[in-house]
């Protein structure tokens, strides 16, 4: 296991796939990191020298990833809630934020159905 940005990255996988295991790095960002550092996307991390791995570490450190990114997202949501915006209200009520319909669907956001338990007898 190679440690990059505080994460144990699997070294038996290709460089792009291994970098994608870091929170905040997707496929396109992983490819651009490999391109900028001059590392082939399809080489396994265990076959790279320590110099190349250090280059990867330095390239990943330029981005906001892992705990810092999670904290930033949480603070952004908290800021919306504190400001009392519509989006903050939707976050506080655990409803869809981006204008999706809620009359049907939205089960993931709303949680399991609340049954009506013979209220209308």
Swiss-Prot record:
Residues 93-121 are annotated as: Disordered. Keywords: Ribonucleoprotein, Ribosomal protein, RNA-binding, rRNA-binding, tRNA-binding. Residues 110-121 have a biased composition (Basic residues). Transmembrane segments: none annotated. One of its GO terms (molecular function) is tRNA binding. Belongs to the universal ribosomal protein uS13 family. Part of the 30S ribosomal subunit. Forms a loose heterodimer with protein S19. Forms two bridges to the 50S subunit in the 70S ribosome. Located at the top of the head of the 30S subunit, it contacts several helices of the 16S rRNA. In the 70S ribosome it contacts the 23S rRNA (bridge B1a) and protein L5 of the 50S subunit (bridge B1b), connecting the 2 subunits; these bridges are implicated in subunit movement. Contacts the tRNAs in the A and P-sites. This is Small ribosomal subunit protein uS13.
